[in-house]
Design a protein with these regions (language model features):
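Mobile active-site "lid"/loop adjacent to the S-adenosyl-L-methionine
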Residues: 165-166, 204-233
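Class I SAM-dependent transferase core
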Residues: 82-131
């Protein structure tokens, strides 16, 4: 770890490499990234080629990158292996999680391997790691341990579970690699390893990819025939595993079927426990199944192959039979506590924003005000999100653009004026009392009209409560 940091294998420098062709699906960017790395001829380039990009290097290059003694030890423990002409590369994939390092399997080479840290996992860590220190946290389905390692900085005790024994072994190794000692690794399916325990925080990215008939199941990938069977099973047992006011952040790409509202599907999965839960669905990118099938069929292989077209077609036929046309990537935020409520918010694609736990804190607190009732809303202090801008785009219409994670929206000029007044007032009640007489209707009617406008602004994220 010290050597990797010495040669600048960190988020900033590795990010400059992964930005190359970053909008292209894996593995299309690989040739261009390697082209740039091979031109560097320095320790950083050699290390990334051997440890991150499966591009064998010579003994001299390995020694320059890592030092001869360390290379010998890595070969001895199997983190570097000999390839053609005796060149060296890792059979694993080295990734980054925060300031730490994470070894995972090359999923194209290892049968039912262990997933590491990709774009969605990094987004899940940013959203799921709490803003305050907590006593206990659970990484459910830990894979190589990325989320557990991130949680270990904010939790006194972390439990990490997985149904795959190889995942537990690799995650335990990664924790030791990063000098982390407060993670308890347990083998088992979903909540079985934690029995009757409850946690302050639960974070999970369960497998949610659909599995067509007659295809080989992969533990890290498939969530069932439709893809959401495993996530729904997880949600059905979730709330009792949370402490009072505990929060779960569960990432799922939900197949959209028969125009069934996502709020209803999540509520049905939670069952009777939904009456004791606050549910906030953060809807990120929506993907058409044509793109989904193409990306996954191609991404499971290092390069185009004769099986690519047949695999993509098999997946597409499967979705057609189920009536699925789109998939919705969603961060499902569930808190245990009253009053119970459900809400959903459109957010930017995870690759275009960094949705953090602090954003979720604000959104949950604000929606909680609506559920708490009229008096709570009137007595609250609401503010426009930091960095939001208001631009008149048409007669009577104003476009609101957010600096963080929410999608832009349009509101009326009257609504924008109301928002500005609430933003400047000590409380919502003060703003309404000042505005109501100017609305040209009886005073009580004006108060209700203004309060309804505040509710709408809160619903769309134009006004937020400070948690």
């Amino acid at each position: 770890v010290a050597r990797l940091r010495d040669i600048h294998v960190d988020a900033e420098h590795v990010g400059r490499v992964t930005q190359i062709c970053e909008k292209m699906p894996s593995p299309l960017p690989l040739p261009m990234r390697l082209w740039h790395l091979r031109r560097r001829r320095d320790a950083f380039g050699f290390a990334l080629r051997a440890l991150m990009f499966d591009d064998p290097i010579s003994d001299d290059e390995a020694a320059e990158a890592l030092g001869a003694d360390l290379v010998s030890r890595l070969v001895e423990v199997g983190l570097l292996t000999r390839r053609a002409q005796g060149r060296l590369a890792s059979p694993f994939h080295l990734g980054l999680i925060g300031s730490g390092f994470l070894f995972s399997d090359d999923l194209q080479q290892v049968e039912d391997g262990v997933m590491g840290s990709g774009r969605t996992t990094r987004g899940l860590c940013a959203a799921g790691v709490p803003t305050r220190h907590v006593d206990s946290a659970l990484d459910l389905g830990c894979g190589a341990g990325a989320v557990a390692i991130a949680l270990s900085e904010r939790a006194t005790r972390v439990v990490a579970t997985d149904v795959n024994p190889r995942a537990i072994e690799l995650a335990r190794f990664n924790a030791a690699l990063n000098g982390i000692a407060n993670i308890d690794f347990r083998l088992g399916d979903l909540f079985e390893p934690v029995a009757e325990e409850a946690f302050d925080v639960i974070v999970s990215q369960p497998p949610f990819i659909s599995r067509p008939p007659d295809t080989r199941p992969q533990t890290w990938l498939h969530g069932g025939e439709r893809g959401d069977e495993l996530p729904r099973r997880l949600l059905s047992a979730l709330v009792p595993r949370l402490r009072e006011s505990g929060r779960a952040v569960i990432m799922v790409e939900w197949p959209e079927v028969d125009n069934e509202p996502l709020e209803q599907r999540v509520g049905d999965a939670l069952g009777a426990d939904s009456s004791a839960a606050r549910v906030l669905l953060l809807k990120a990118e929506r993907t058409r199944v044509d793109e989904h099938c193409t990306a996954y069929a191609f991404g499971l292989r290092r390069e185009p192959s004769p099986e690519f077209a047949s695999t993509a077609t098999l997946w597409r036929d499967h979705f057609e039979r189920m009536g699925v046309q789109t998939l919705q990537l969603t961060l499902n935020v569930i808190e245990r506590g009253l009053p119970a409520w459900k809400a959903s918010v459109e957010v930017r694609p995870l690759g275009a924003s960094q949705l953090k736990a602090s954003h979720i804190d604000h959104l949950v607190a604000t929606r909680g005000l609506l559920a708490a009732g009229r008096d709570a809303l009137l007595g609250s202090t609401l503010r426009v999100p930091e960095g939001a801008s208001f631009l008149e785009v048409a007669s009577g219409r104003v476009r609101v653009t957010f600096a963080d994670v929410l999608e832009p929206i349009e509101i009326t000029k009257g609504a924008a004026a109301l928002v500005a007044n609430v933003h400047e007032a000590a409380t919502v009640r003060d703003a309404i009392e000042a505005l109501a007489p100017t609305l040209g209707v009886p005073l009580d009617e004006g108060r209700e009209k203004a309060l309804d406008g505040v509710r709408q602004a809160v619903t769309f994220g134009v006004l937020l409560s400070l948690p």
